[in-house]
Amino acid sequence: MEKIVLLFAIVSLVKSDQICIGYHANNSTEQVDTIMEKNVTVTHAQDILEKTHNGKLCDLDGVKPLILRDCSVAGWLLGNPMCDEFINVPEWSYIVEKANPANDLCYPGDFNDYEELKHLLSRINHFEKIQIIPKNSWSSHEASLGVSSACPYQGKSSFFRNVVWLIKKNNAYPTIKRSYNNTNQEDLLVLWGIHHPNDAAEQTRLYQNPTTYISVGTSTLNQRLVPKIATRSKVNGQNGRMEFFWTILKPNDAINFESNGNFIAPEYAYKIVKKGDSAIMKSELEYGNCNTKCQTPMGAINSSMPFHNIHPLTIGECPKYVKSNRLVLATGLRNSPQRERRRKKRGLFGAIAGFIEGGWQGMVDGWYGYHHSNEQGSGYAADKESTQKAIDGVTNKVNSIIDKMNTQFEAVGREFNNLERRIENLNKKMEDGFLDVWTYNAELLVLMENERTLDFHDSNVKNLYDKVRLQLRDNAKELGNGCFEFYHKCDNECMESVRNGTYDYPQYSEEARLKREEISGVKLESIGTYQILSIYSTVASSLALAIMVAG
């Protein structure tokens, strides 16, 4: 009889009404790193490192790029006959040049301050080509005989389309004095050149005068050129060389030319009608008939992520380049689902779950919440208010990081001439150093934010637990695993009052007091003495004691 009484008392305790505080868990295998830990499994995570591109050259915000194909910038501007498709070009978003374009300076030579000119082009979006000195205006000089087999067109000798190679006429080369006044409202890009013959015989054959010069002057330019006559190896079948120059002629300024030989005169100039962010990008890609906000030499990026690891050189509204291979931001909680335990026919609601033992996969409509068990049944209920606040907080954090990193900028490689190799090497080392620092900062930012996010979730669960504990006080017992065992009956209405913060402590305090006194000890008459048994709150302990007494 005593055994039956004791067993009945224990089972009654096991069936006491309970409420637990816990958090959401799922089948996610997403892992993040924090300052303190690596490979922490979380319920939700967001990759913030873009690793993909489309492998194409695209329009940038609806404006097509100027893809020079087999032409170089020099070949385009001077008018290499093989670059006729670029005689007139519309507005461009950026310029694409191959690493080694075939159609460059067809007549061998050099383009003075070429790298500086390219840098200038990275701030221009549109040229308008205008004629400044008509080719037919050179009545005292031959303007059509200045051609070369090095610049063929349709099987015949030709020359650059935008400049005129002036040759002697009737064995005379009168001194040239020409001026052009820029009456436009825009700046003007003006190009000209000088021919360096192979020997003195070629000099007099072309220009009659054995000693010649070219003078060029503007309000800011004072240049005097003389030909360098020397024996050279043949390039493109030519022993001679040409050297080209450029300047920006401001509105209302004039450019003055004077020469008695070797002069390559401008016929056309480029009116700079639109300035803006552009770039000259080295790429072998083809046009993909697509649109993007961010272009790299490897392809276009269409992403809202704040970082990418595709290529350090970009144009447009791009994520920041980092050298990292993985940047994952925690947005959810630590994911440690409880192990599913077999349910016995004993009226228990299953594994007691809490924020200490593990998360609940059964709670799918919130990050934090409750599990209750009473005579009416058991179930999960998310705490919508704390969940929504947490979602808003994490979302704002992610958006803030993205907004800070997604800024309009361009990072295109700078070009240096042969005399500036040490500067180029120093520049590369500095850029590599900046990338290393930025990569470190990005990785550290992610580690710190992940640590804060997981701590934030832990704190929210603890706050929810304290909210319940302060309401129940001594009307329930803390089981130490995120659960409370009521000392009174708590139906579904009572459970809801605990969840929404309206639990009426005085209403249940008397019933709870009597229950506490009832279970404070058990009288064991069979041995004629009384002992106080510690009643364990866990399911396993209760069942083990029941089996021992019954046996």
UniProtKB/Swiss-Prot annotation:
Pfam families linked to this entry: Hemagglutinin
InterPro entries: Capsid_hemagglutn (IPR008980), Hemagglutn_HA1_a/b_dom_sf (IPR013828), Hemagglutn_influenz_A (IPR000149), Hemagglutn_influenz_A/B (IPR001364)
Organism: Influenza A virus (strain A/Hong Kong/212/2003 H5N1 genotype Z+)
Presence of keyword RNA-binding: no
Keyword Lipoprotein: yes
Signal peptide: 1-16
Extracellular compartment spans: 17-530
Protein name as annotated: Hemagglutinin
Transmembrane segments: 531-551
Compartments, record wording: Virion membrane; Host apical cell membrane
